[in-house]
Amino acid sequence: MKSTAPSYLKHHFLIAMPQMADPNFAQTLIYLIEHGPEGAMGLIVNRPSGLSLADVLEQLRPDEPIPALCQSLPIFAGGPVQTDRGFVLHSAEQQFQATLMLGPLGMSTSQDVLFAIADGQGPQRHFVALGYAGWEAGQLEAELADNTWLSCPADPQILFDLPHDQRLQAAAASLGVDLRLLSTQVGHA
């Protein structure tokens, strides 16, 4: 008898299907940082929070001048869990005080990465979010079985090079899917 080991989706994108009813996740693209038997963790990568890096730096180091470039660096709403906690996905050429290497990317959660970005000494490519999306053991697998999500390998070009409002469709297009043509009604054959 053939054994079937679970397939995990670390370093994949989750693409919300059109019928996604949860407003936290409707029309989202999520980068999966971790996925295993204990659950999953990811960051929504296409939902700006309305804050900029300058707004965050004003809180973290109020006595220092804020570089002008920080006004145009958006902070994204990474998910509904721990929305006051920052996460920085970045190219892997640098490590910081709290960096988890994710293959071609790093994820840092310490303030030093934000200061490095602000000072022009940070990673070449970066994405900053507050909060994350989390799933308990088996929860994401159940949602995938219910056709709530599509998944595809994560593409750093989609994450770093495309405007946020093009990322969801670009990830779907990498699978040959146009989300605008999908029905909001689903079932199982």
Curated annotation (Swiss-Prot):
Pfam families attached to this UniProt entry: DUF179
Gene3D superfamilies the UniProt entry points to: VC0467-like
SUPFAM superfamilies, A to Z: VC0467-like
Source organism, top-level taxon: Bacteria
One CC-aspect GO term: cytosol
Family: Belongs to the UPF0301 (AlgH) family.
Protein name in the entry: UPF0301 protein PST_3956
Organism field: Stutzerimonas stutzeri (strain A1501)
